[in-house]
Amino acid sequence: MQIKPLGRSRFKPVTLLVPKWRELVAYTPSGIKKAKGAGACYDLLKSLEMHNLYVSHTLKDLLNTTGSHMWQAEMWKGHVTTMSLDGTKVKVHSLRRILDDFDGDEQKYLAFLELAEWLHDWGVAPGSISAMAWNLWRSTLDQEFSLSFNSQIGRQSFYGGRQEATPGQTYSDFIAVDISSAYPYEMARRPYAGTLREVSPRTPLEPEIAGIAQARVFVPNDLPHSPLPTRSGNESLAWSKGWIEGSWTWSELSAAKSLGCKVEVSRCWAPLTEVQPFEKWWEVVREGRATLSPAAAKLVKSLSNSLWGMFGMTGDDRGVVRWTDQLGNSPEMVQKRSKSLPQSNTAHIAAETTSRVRVRMLLEGLYSPSDLSPNNPVHVDTDGVIIPREALKSFNEMMIGNKSGQWRIKTVMKVIEVRAPQLYRYKTETTTTWQYVASGMTGKQAEELFKRNPQGFGVSLLPNVSQTL
């Protein structure tokens, strides 16, 4: 894939829609506009068809404005990406609930307007979160270059973040820590392979080089945390013991060796060309996160965290949804044929990025960074762990802080009870009531989910910490 610097963009006004039952409020650059009744909602939407339109929450709420039979939803991997209105050029994107922590629709609109103005300075037009993330990166490039490697091999070594938990247990004196700006920091830290070439299986697996290898690995059964992911089904990851086979990055296989695993490489690929295309981008992102308002800065953070996944996108599992009723209760999906995306041969970039974060989680979060003894985590989630407070002593002073790439202390927990990855509750030294945490939910929603699942669910089990402490 040839990556080119961003060219000229077409700019349109941005508008935030707040849909209700047969009502619509639109926050526009020229003021707030309102409509009541299905016909009036349609007319208002049509008048805004030359705007970039967004909702803060779910796109499906738009069905309530005019009736669902007038809308069409674009789907990708089971998620609605955009919705369009019949007889108009209206196309609506979602802000993916990024601003849910901020009160008031007007405040959310002003935050997005601030983001749009900041992007304008870089020549980036508003669009979907993914499109803005991609074009912001391209705006920081000063020359064209190539990213291209065998898509099958790249995808075989592409795994997601590590998520594990010990459900149904209560622990005392624990601490939640995470790596600040883990993904963008690792993207900018060292070079990637522009493309790779096959080399001898006996080639040393240098952890700082962005290589890939197919290997057979023996993970000792007494190792507390398996270092390498394998696939269980299409989406789930497993952390298995004994003999496993697969493709991983050099960095991840080197980490496995350091923990005592036996690695037998059958095929190996090393960088033929190297590129470091994210340094300027990371400078721009950090500037935006530091200078914009908290709400707008959170949107910039979302853009920066979305970029790496673009390199692993595929054009399969696509479709459109129509509704045959006015209430949105009778959806019909039409599957669309798979198409080849330009990013289909850049999966090695996504694979290397996620691997870098997993290796740090493994060698610093799950195991002690000083001597590789177990840190005994009870909760692992992508770029953060919850570990005994005592384990923090193995981190040196330079590793802990609020700078990008450092381990940040989020919460000191007097008591914690875990149900699943991204689902737990805790008390601090200064609180007497439980604080509930669940990904993408309010505290009240998290509490309800927590109480509905007393034994936990769908988890990858960690060793029982009460038996290892």
Kindly give the residue locations of the regions a language model identified.
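Conserved acidic
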Residues: 1-12, 18-469
